[in-house]
Amino acid sequence: MRLSRRSFLRSSSLAAAAAGALPALAEPRGETGKPSPVKLGMCSYTFRNFTRDQMIPFLKQLRMNELNAKDAKDHLPVDPVQEAAAVADYTANGIRLHAAGAIYFRQNSDDAIRAQFEYVKRAGIPVIVAGDPTPETLPRIEKFVKEYDIKIAIHNHGPEDKLWPSPLEILPDIQGMDPRIGCCIDVGHTVRAGTDVVEAIHRVGPRLFDMHMKDLTSFTDKESQVAVGDGKMPVREIFEALTAIRYPGFVDLEYEVHADDPMPGVIASIAYMRGVLTGMGYRE
């Protein structure tokens, strides 16, 4: 059963976790429970209106050291010199880049696709979150996946996306391709496409390479995004499904509302997810 934020805060064990997390996420985590099989990360797109120098202190406040970086602002510039400076900044601050994107493959040519793989390789990132590869582009992309040993996680974009509204539309087109070609499930876009997100996780299984987490008050309204825990997203069931398939990747918060002041919603979202994991008997 899904916990609302109110029910979550009324639960004695979870209330203790949330009470400590909401006002001061920089406080040390508790050491009770088993290590969590669900690993939380952050989409840098959440902080798209902030520079890297502004974002890094936010991540430290959140005690978050895993980042899905995008070329928004100066988060992960395409220019090689600027990109190297960004990677050095993250490394110096203990932040690991586990995914890049969303990255778009707008040209079906070797030169254009190689440029994207080189960009990600320079940063030492193992996963590309791909926004728009077409079925016709995938065989060419597969060639570079094999050459660079970098995974491609195709990101679904809901009912507006004529190619990949949900992960279930991606699977038929990658069947039989290199196992490093898979999905990034965006939970909000998935439910808006009318797909059961928990079922989708089980169906995608070993081809799931990244997750974008958000919450909605209406599964038919793109504009209804709220902090995780304030909507209808079945967060605990999602975490249970990820645990069941032994998902090795990250659940990256993509908080797209209040772009000029995202931290209140981000703090509430991270606190809620950490509290759910505590309630499942885990420590992050």
Where do the language-model regions lie?
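Short, exposed beta-strand "edge-strand" segments with a Pro/Gly-rich flavor and a Y/T-containing core
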Residues: 44-50, 71-81, 160-165, 229-233
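Mobile, glycine- and charge-enriched loop segments
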Residues: 31-46, 87-91, 96, 100, ...
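Structural motif corresponding to the early beta-alpha repeats
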Residues: 65-151, 161, 189
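Active-site beta-loop-alpha junctions enriched in small/polar residues
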Residues: 43-47, 70-74, 102-105, 133, ...
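A generic hydrophobic-segment detector
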Residues: 149-172
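Short, mixed-charge, low-aromatic patches
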Residues: 40-46, 69-73, 94-98, 124-131, ...
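Hydrophobic faces of well-ordered beta-strands that scaffold small-molecule active sites
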Residues: 38-43, 67-69, 97-102, 128-130, ...
